[in-house]
Amino acid sequence: MKSLFVKITALALLVASVFTLAGCNGTPENNDTPESKDEPYAYEIGKVYAVIDVKDFGKITVELCPGDAPISVENFVELANRGIYKNSTFHRILSNFMIQGGAPADDSIELTPIVGEFEANGYTNNIDHVRGVISMARTTVNDSATSQFFICNANYPSLNGQYAGFGFVVKGMDVVDAITTYGMQHTSYQYNGMIYDESKQPVISDISIVDNRISSAN
């Protein structure tokens, strides 16, 4: 069984991005209308997105925010491009809180922890933990996040300044809600939301990156 958090193996990752960094302008998508569900999302130039494909549930499109959390975004993008998220799962699900996943399917993979980009750790991060925000999961150690992330299915302000939000859902909150409803039927312990039967954990088929940022190196 996967542990709640992947093994911490090294010092925090320092990222030097060659892309221009811009903050996110917008708000999380709260409701998919029936008319919009089947239409492709219009990706904007200058922004970077992640498409989380969840088997039997659908796709969650997330706009990433390198201007607010550059280290978290670049780490997430790198891991996605390496295929680390293929066949990972959402293993912890709580209604009125979040869905958590992203531990590598291969337990032998060792990942480098990154700096926690949040106020309590000395970083300015303007992303609040409202419904639709994606954020890095971690242990009680500030600089311990690796691959695991969570998506808020409700506003959760007590996390503000304590965890590194790095993007928000722009399409697919209906998928997040469906995963939440399903997960609450299979959690072994309502208190922590863990789904201990791995065969019942929703599977992340893959996470693909749509990077429309303009390189500053011309």
Annotated model-derived regions:
Residues 22-218:
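Cyclophilin-like peptidyl-prolyl cis-trans isomerases
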Residues 3-26:
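Sec-dependent N-terminal signal peptides of Gram-positive bacterial secreted proteins and lipoproteins
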